[in-house]
Amino acid sequence: MKKILSLVSVAAFALTAQSQTATLTIDATQKGVDISPTLYGLFYEEINHAGEGGLYAELIRNRSFEEIDQGLPNRRFDNGRGERFGRPANPNLIPFWSAEGGAEMNALTEGLMNDVQTRALRLTASAKASKASPSGIKNSGFWGIKATKGDKYTLTFWAKADSKTKFSITTGLKADGEWKAQKTFAKTVTPVWQKYKVTFKGKADADEAEFFFLLNKPGTICLDMMSLFPPTYKNRPNGCRKDLAEKLADLHPKFMRFPGGCFVEGMSRETAYEWKRTIGPVEDRPGHMNANWGYPCTDGMGYHEYLQLAEDLGAEPLYVVNVGIWHGGNQPYDQIEEYIQNALDAIEYANGDASTVWGRKRIENGHKKPSNLRLIEVGNENYQVNPNEQSDHYAERYAQFYKAIKAKYPYVQLIGNVESWGTDYPSWRNDNPVDLLDEHYYRSPSWFASKFHHYDSYDRQGPKIYCGEYAVTSDCGEGNLKAALGEAVFMMGMENNGDVVAMASYAPIFVNVHDRRWMPDMIRFDAAQSWASPSYYVQGLMAKNVGTHTVKTTLTQTKQPKPDRFRVGLGAWNTTVEYKGLHVTTPDGRTLYKQVPPTSSQWPAVDIKDWDITAGTWESDLLDKDGIIRQTAIAEHCVAICPTEMQARDYDVTVQARKTGGDEGFLLVFDHTGKRNYRWFNVAGWGNTQHAVEDIFNSGKTQPASARGHIDDNR
């Protein structure tokens, strides 16, 4: 039996007081395309303190006393392993730590616990220190530390003393002068660095507590790697903050991309992400400067932890490899063997067994089961329109990675970069084979709302699409319902093109509200709580209710009523142009407006000074026999509206146009009834890649029709 569902919706349009009726007919018996079972996933990047002080559950900031960048974020020093942290005027400054109860603390730079650590802390308690008046240090955490009644906290630290000494120590969390969690214990410390572990429970709640480590008698102790963890997601050691990880799990992700983003590349070779320095015991990880987003990373949440989190979320891991490019420079493309080997070793670490070097290291690090890594992205935003940007020889780099990875791991799916900005239709401009292409879109709500059909024209025989980064980033504040609805329309379009779009991920996910480097973000948090934007709930709604396939639909709607009276206009966007011969006629041949040469007497010669100018530099050449109109500014939204008001139900607009310079093409304005209500034919927009008709009603924009295309200069 054929089932037909009919839905009728009424929407009010800003241009007129009339309503438009649309009827959507759904035929559930006629199958369309299969929807990708891996469509919705996560894009994770260390940005906005997403990990440090966020998803990575470590509560103590500057736990290894390495960070000395307070107040001088743009200075760097070389510690023998490359750029890491800044050098303040006072090298003894230890950010986020302070002395309490008359104690003295100093940076220790000799006799360290290993070759990775460059500093430790030497604590000397007050000569009057006692159990009633202890003396020591405190840490402010990442804008506070949450204390929770009943939660178990795990403190680990490394210590040594000048001689074998038994210390009485009080530690815990304190807020407003009161202990919210506390434990007093005794430890014998020797001149050899040793690791100590203590647990204690919270006895009261506080949103912004501080951590204290106090000596109950005079003495000197050297400390390093002072670490405090609350209960973690799935009780993983060195794991994730529960509420943030649970919010990720509630999105039902099918994959998790990591570690970025620009975080992959860094601002130099030394500040790029190197996975081999992020595995093993945390005290053996040097950390690195997250130069792109302006803060140091412990790399406590490293490659191993990313793989573990993906497994815990039920998501496939998607690892982004560096192709020898960083922001502002690169390794010559014919000298990238080290980067290729790093990628091969990363796959071996994830998937190898005990007979392999890196598989054995994974097992030694506590994860016997392989991680089934089969998705590798080759580079991040490295294939741009302008080859003089950071995308130096991306195609040649990609080809080397493809050959090496497919030879050893033929099952691995490789994701290539395409243009990440400057166009709505990025393309793979080389002959190398590729499994998926990564497209990025950061646009307005109206752009997304107009893009339901975006993928309709894509080649069904070409590479699959991974829309790896997308979000409304303008006209949305910190994220609102309008943004979420625009994204939802775009997401439905991806589902409707399931034979093309295989994967998609919103970006970015997290922001610590105390250090926003990007806006908007899906999940916001501070030390005590987390909350989500409307976009987060749309992501969850779509992922939890994704179907297996589409069905046939037919949409019929009344046309938007045309205005009774209107004007027309000309425009340009970051382009210099010339126009002549503007002519507006009715279907029966009646002329409503005509741009004529200065010698004509039938119609007055056009003088652009009489037009309504929105922006740009406009001039009309009254001496030219054709009366040419020129726009010579390189600026956005350069529009000139003809002063003549016309009246007709249907009409044709013709004009001759020539592009003389700039990035795009022409704008032909019609149905203009005011600055906030008009339509235009956008020829060669979006970086000279696309033609489109766009409707602007009450300043909101939709795109009823579009097609790929470009124009040449001086034609």
Regions found by a protein language model. Give the residues of each.
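Catalytic-core region of carbohydrate-active enzymes that cleave or remodel glycosidic bonds
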Residues: 308-309, 400-413, 428-431, 435-545
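Aromatic- and acidic-residue-enriched carbohydrate-binding clefts of CAZyme catalytic domains
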Residues: 42, 73-122, 264-303, 335-339, ...
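Extracellular beta-strand ligand-recognition surfaces/modules
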Residues: 23-26, 195-228, 363-365, 560-574, ...
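Extra-cytoplasmic beta-strand recognition segments
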Residues: 61-68, 121, 136-169, 194-201, ...
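Active-site cleft segment of glycoside hydrolase catalytic domains centered on the general acid/base Glu
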Residues: 176-187, 195-197, 202, 230, ...
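Extracellular carbohydrate recognition and processing domains
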Residues: 176-206, 560-562, 704-714
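Short carbohydrate-recognition loop motifs
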Residues: 108-133, 619-639, 651, 690-696
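Secretory/extracellular carbohydrate-interaction modules
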Residues: 633-701
